[in-house]
Amino acid sequence: MSSSPLRLALALMCLVSAVGVISCGRPHVVLNSALEEARNVPFGEEVPERLTLPELQWMLSNNELTPVQVEEAPRSRLELVRRDNTVTSKPLNCMNYFWKSRTAC
């Protein structure tokens, strides 16, 4: 019976520590500076502008897109050649043993 109060106390301590970590987290400015240092971007240097989804949609709808031209495949690739699968005349009563990879006549 002593294990259930012990488990309850342990669960409460875990809950309190999790709430403490969440509520006492680092301020936003400290986190941003740490992230900039990790990306090797000097503090104070301008980061490229980030656009929202509606702004991007507006920009794309107002710009006329040029059609993409498909480039020809490089000539270094081997071109596929269809094999001539015409029916060859076989002698009568020839048996094809496909599991043996041969034909017996």
From Swiss-Prot:
Which range is the signal sequence, renumbered to this chain?
1-24
Q: Where in the cell is it found?
A: Secreted
Q: Report the SS bond pairs.
A: 94-105
Q: In which tissues is it expressed?
A: Pancreas.
As for family, the record states: Belongs to the somatostatin family.
**Chief place where the protein resides:** secreted
Which residues have a glycan attached per UniProt?
88
Q: What protein name is recorded for this chain?
A: Somatostatin-2
Positions annotated as pro-peptide in this chain are 25-81
- PTM field: O-linked glycan consists of Gal-GalNAc disaccharide which is modified with sialic acid residues (microheterogeneity).
Gene name, Swiss-Prot/TrEMBL: sst2
Q: What else is known?
A: Biological activity of somatostatin-22 on rat pituitary cells was found to be only 0.01-0.1% of somatostatin-14 activity.
What species was this sequence derived from? Ictalurus punctatus
Per UniProt, which keywords does this protein have?
Cleavage on pair of basic residues, Disulfide bond, Glycoprotein, Hormone, Secreted, Signal
Lineage, uppermost ranks: Eukaryota, Metazoa, Chordata, Craniata, Vertebrata
> Which GO MF term does the entry hold, naming one?
hormone activity
Q: What does this protein do?
A: Somatostatin inhibits the release of somatotropin.
